[in-house]
Amino acid sequence: MISSTGSSIPMDTLRISPVDICGRPHILRQSSADGPRRRPSLLLFGYAMQLRIKLYDLILAFANALDQVHPALTGHHRRVGFLLDRLAERLGLPSEERERLFLAGIMHDVGVIPLKTSAEDLVFERERYLHPQAGCLFLQNCPTLAEEAERVRFHHMYWEKACDRGLAAREGSLINIADRVDVDLRAKNDFREAVEGADRRVCERRPGIYSPDHIEAMQDILHDEETLNDLAGAHIRLPAFVRRRYGNQILTPQETIRFSTLFGHIIDSCSPFTATHSTGVAHMAVALGRLTGMGQDDLDTLFVAGMLHDIGKLGIPLALLEKPGQLTDEEFPKVKRHADLSRLWLDAVPGFERVSVWGGGHHERLDGKGYPLGLKGEEIPLPSRIMAIADVFTALTEDRPYRKGMTPPEALRIVKGMVKQGHLDGDLSRLLCDHADELDAVRASSQAEARRGFQALHDACAEPDERLRD
């Protein structure tokens, strides 16, 4: 195997795809609507470098994306995390517990995404235990977040049940009071009036919902002028606060991959029609990239970009994403905005510059008629071209509200047509056709595995954890 720098890569170092692509590696020419072009420089390729991402940079960026799911959630996860840190400080909890609570707090509602139907359901869900259970099951798939997952499981449990169920349940109940207070703080436009209302409601709730110690600590927070000023600007000040409080833990490339896989699954869970889309795109892009001679570090980055390429869809109304008919002239720009959001949110993570360009460029086209930037020809780096083909082929084979999924031969015909129209890279298209069976097997097997995971999540939520019921 020939790497992007020309060195040999042993097959046993190829870690990502469950199906290895065998056969002679291909060195691609760059092509465009106007014909063959020279291969881009490594500056466009992005250099071969390991992913070195800070844990909290990644977590905060994803919390920001979660906060865009609905206007009712804007800033919610970040403020809950901030409130939890201040609560833990006043309660005298050890630093390890404070950090665990903060992490759980800024991701506590990840389970609402596959269950959401309306703004009311997001905040005042009738079955309070369902989205905590879904969130816990999501987070358990990332070993780094195993303990936080248990806190998320119990974050709607009342104190009267949590107090004798262990540390995870007690800390989950602490998330509950921070969660509810933030909802109350957003109930009115006037922040000071909202603070007074939140303070009053903390005491008015019936005995047993919150711990008396938690109530006292929360009232201290709601009467502390400095804390209130910080809370009012928590979405602005939080990154600096986190770096000061919790340090700069660097994730290994494989940990970054696991986090990105988790986030990709959460993104895809927005709709049953896209429940395995990012998984298929990521694995197919890596398999195709491997055939071009990309090195392992670049393949790792390509995989992460594939898992996160549609993160911007969290900011698009589900009704538009699942519309069965043709989008109107007013609706199409709103859907296209997901690519802008993907680039914006990914670019906010230091070290994700290539992930942002490669993943956020999956709708760019060689003739300059793509989006979000309208890049043309050599302005589009090879990994972005790979992502575009992987995205198109995977999407064509999936069922959508407006059509049934195509067979691989039908999808290949569409890809070839897009090459003729000047949209997609001709060399990559030929490589796809030459290895169609192997590449489609990678896509199909990875999506089948992801589908089994979503089915397990669905089944688990259909049989709720009795510990979470009132």
Predicted stretch roles:
Residues 1-8, 15-17:
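Low-acidity, Ser/Thr- and Arg-rich intrinsically disordered low-complexity segments
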Residues 50-470:
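Histidine- and acidic-residue-rich, metal-dependent catalytic cores
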Residues 16-18, 31-33:
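Intrinsic disorder/low-complexity segments
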